[in-house]
Amino acid sequence: MSKFLDMLSGSQCVSLEKCGDVVVSTNDCMIALYCHFCRDLFTQLPEFLRHLQSNHSDVLHFTKEHNVYSVEELLSGEQDKAHEDAQSAGHNSSSGDSRSLMNSEDSRAIDGSEENSDNSPVKPEQIGKQNEINLLAEVTNILLQTNDKERINDELKPESGVFKGARKKANNESSSLKICDLKSHTIARTSRKRMSLVKNHILRVLDRDLSAKLEMKPLEPNSKLPITEPIQEDNIPGTCFQTPPKPIPSLSQLSVRKSSLTEANHICTKYATNKTAPTVPKLLNNVPKSILTSQQAQVNSDSSEINETYHISEAGSQVTKTTKSFPVKINQIEILQPLKLPKTLITPINEEGVSDQMENSTKNINNAQRKKENPKKFFKKPSELGIKTQGSPNKFLNIIKSKANPIIVNRVQTTSAKASTNKIQIRFNDKTKGFASEFNSTKIRKLKMENCVDLKTEDPCDNTNMRLNKMATIGSCEILKAVGLPAITDNAIEAIMLLPDELETMRKKADQFTKIYRKYDSIWNYRKIFPPAKPDFISQKIFALTREVNKTMLCNLANSDIKGIINQISVWHYNIYTQYIDLDTISEIARYTLKVFSFLPVSFAYFCKCCDDIFILKKEYLKHLISHQVRFQCTKCIKVFKYKGYYEKHLRNAHP
């Protein structure tokens, strides 16, 4: 062997390099090649040679690609492939037998070549022939391999065409799939099939649900078809939606008492006044009554004890068409003669006595009315109603009744020769002066009745609200007068009610208040300040403003009064700019006040009088004020209560 190595090293065409050693394992009888450069172990020679050529070419300096080991690599690869093909296609015995025979023949040929190559000594001519033999064997092996692959593919193709074999690689056709690759491919294929089945099932369910929604219910076999022919209206019986006529009552049923009649009583008496004139007086109560016409005011109503019977004759012809009105039609009314009253109720009256007593009564009435209707200093005097003095020729007796001492007003019918108009006598008792206010309350109503003027119904709630609003206006006007700004509530107050000296004093107070109010810009400019001030800070500023105003102007105003003044000034200033476009059209007093408050912005805020809350919107402010309205307030400690029970309990516990 040493001679052979010396021959190879001595020749110029062969250069040898020691790249590794052979390592033997005694436990499992395995041989491995040890690399000197990277100290790795390789179990096969082709792998070791490929490792040297790829990783250590810079040290070994390979000049060309060596194919000495290519045949051995192919043979070793063919053996591995034969084992894999035998395992994958074990069901086909014929293909396995043929492949094993071919592999055995190739192995024999290779063994023979290896034995020949191992003989000693080897000449160059023999080496060249051996290379040619190796090339021929390699070519034949490649051809056999391709033929075997084509034959195996033809045999394994299924007839149905659904089965798909292993995918071929375009770059390396010689390498086939391993067992692990085949298993993963099979698993992936089966999973795809299962997922496709699940997908198809889901799609079928969705289609079924959609079709069930859109599908209409089939018609029943016994169902009737809709009518397509026009309806014959002549065959349909007519329907009457009117109420059937009520039976006409008999004459005995129509005999009723006068006290039980309501509206029919007025209609009957109206018809009776056109024929006969009454002679019995009528009692007038101080309670407001319903609206009376000029003809109804002349009707003489007796006491509730008088009975009147109305005989109503049936109509000659009844109307066949029914209506919603009263079923009985009144054609004729007969009134019985009135009862004769005793002579003590009716006393003779002289014209002169009537005129004297009438003058005295009117004087007392005027005096009582003057005491009640004193005009306020800061409001216009209300206009009085005009009173007509002309009397009608058909006037009758009127009785004004009070609780303890009635005042009787009797009418006396005179001839046209003695007097042109009828006069009224008022008989006063000794204690009638105490009831002058009650008589005064009904004076305007009595005058309207005498002059045929319709009375309007009076709502006590409306009167109460008007009285409360009037008192609130008076209170706000008195507060504004303390700071010299009463013209904010009414522009005509200063021009009509105040004297020139008082007007000058009011303007000085207004200027003084304006100078003080101008310092507190955080109050009147609340909406322009950013960030807005907190309610606690604003309440402190209002308290300081109240203290300064009381000290400077010598008045005693509370924080709630100052807040009310601020709100009224802001609202008035806003209304001036929104209601009047041309400032020349407003009055002189309003123009002066507007000039004094020229520093105020148009936007403002509402300050609650009862708490420290501040509001920008008027609706929210009014809604908040309702929460402060209470019905019960203690006069001693000024506490408010929502319910009467709480108020009484407070009085028992806190103020025994």
Swiss-Prot record:
Name a GO CC annotation attached to this entry: autosome
Main localization of the protein? nucleus
Using the UniProt annotation, give all residue ranges assigned to the region (Disordered).
80-131
Signal peptide boundaries: none
**Zinc fingers (C2H2-type) at which residues?**
33-56, 606-628, 632-655
> Where are stretches of biased composition, namely Polar residues?
89-104
Q: Name one GO biological process term.
A: male meiosis I
Keywords from UniProt, A to Z, are: Cell cycle, Chromosome, Chromosome partition, Meiosis, Metal-binding, Nucleus, Repeat, Zinc, Zinc-finger
Question: Which miscellaneous remark does the UniProt record hold?
Answer: Drosophilid specific gene duplication generates rgr and tef. Teflon has a function unique to Drosophilids.
Q: What family classification does the UniProt entry report for this protein?
A: Belongs to the Teflon family.
- Function summary: Specifically required in males for proper segregation of autosomal bivalents at meiosis I. Expression is required in the male germ line prior to spermatocyte stage S4. May have a role as a bridging molecule maintaining adhesion to hold autosome bivalents together via heterochromatic connections.
Q: Please state what the protein is called.
A: Protein teflon
Organism listed in the record: Drosophila sechellia
Give the lineage: Eukaryota, Metazoa, Ecdysozoa, Arthropoda, Hexapoda
